[in-house]
Swiss-Prot record:
The gene is nadK. Signal peptide: none annotated. The active site is at D73 (proton acceptor). It comes from Laribacter hongkongensis (strain HLHK9). It is an enzyme of class 2 (transferase). It comes from the Bacteria. Its EC number is 2.7.1.23. This is NAD kinase.
Length: 291
């Protein structure tokens, strides 16, 4: 078989033995096909690592042609942020819960992966967000987000007050539990639970979704993905900004969070026959067609 990708990186969630078992099965299968397999060092234990080629996850972008994630969307998020700067595509094997991004079921893993690696796939470009936290004119933090950037109240439980600007134009001031700045990928996550819209992955938009606003006039809005969003905390003693729920930065009053689309997109490779709407219908338990 002619392979389009020959150097394959594998990542799994080590805390789940059944996931690691699937990773080892896939690794042996790919190596038997003559492919070079590199496994994330943190995905297996020392006893499981015998005979495997281990590398740090942070080195994947420099070495592999494609990365395969076995687990849930949380694992996919962390790997996506690492690989986006290198434009390395991702394949997701679902061994988590919902699996909006890890769409290949376990029982189809070997056949689907082999087909994709040989060039039979549907590519899908997904945008990321880049953010900068500014305090007293100094940039104190930089992060990427694949799903969303969330600014919210902390453990004190008090509402925060903030102002939002888009391309230096004032949009609104708000008193609420926080704000979700979401990509189309993240529109089916926290944003959706907070009343935000579902955005198709190809829609060039960023959504701004209030979290429990004091005024019911504050509604979600979608803006062009070429825009820059500026969030300024005007009142809040215990506020924090989260990046994909996996990194955070504590905020002080008058801190600003600047958000824009990241320069690179991330390519996800789906099996032939994949449909975004089929996935939504399955994950969200929508009704089937009547005719």
């Amino acid at each position: 078989m002619n392979w389009l990708f020959k150097k394959i990186g594998l990542v799994a969630r080590q805390s789940k033995p059944e996931v690691v078992e699937s990773l080892l099965l896939l690794s042996h299968h790919l190596e038997s096909q003559g492919l070079h397999v590199f496994i994330d060092r943190d995905s297996v234990t020392r006893s499981q690592a015998q005979g495997l080629t281990l590398i740090d996850r942070s080195d994947f972008g420099k070495i592999v042609d494609v990365a395969i994630v076995l687990g849930g969307d949380g694992t996919m998020l962390s790997v996506a942020r690492l690989l986006a700067p290198y434009r390395v595509p991702l394949i997701g094997i679902n061994q988590g819960r919902l699996g909006f991004m890890t769409d290949i079921p376990l029982h189809q893993m070997l056949d689907s992966v082999s087909a994709i690696l040989s060039g039979e796939f549907l590519p899908e470009e997904r945008m990321l967000l880049q953010s900068t936290v500014v305090r007293d004119g100094v940039e104190i933090a930089h992060h990427l987000a694949f799903n969303d950037i969330v600014i919210n109240r902390g453990a004190m439980g008090q509402m925060i007050e903030f102002e939002v600007f888009v391309d230096n134009q004032f949009v609104y001031s708000q008193r609420s539990d926080g704000l979700i700045i979401s990509t189309p990928t993240g529109s089916t996550a926290y944003s959706l639970a907070s009343g935000g819209p579902i955005l198709h992955p190809t829609v060039p938009a960023i959504s701004l979704v209030p979290i429990c606003p004091q005024s019911l006039n504050n509604r979600p809005i979608a803006i062009n993905d070429s825009s820059e969003v500026e969030f300024m905390l005007t009142r809040g003693i215990d506020a924090r900004v989260h990046f994909d729920g996996q990194a955070h930065c504590d905020l002080m009053e008058l801190d600003r969070v600047l958000v824009r689309r990241y320069r690179n997109s991330l390519k996800i490779l789906h099996p032939l026959g994949y449909s975004y709407f089929d996935m939504l219908r399955q994950k969200l338990h929508w009704g089937e067609r009547l005719l």
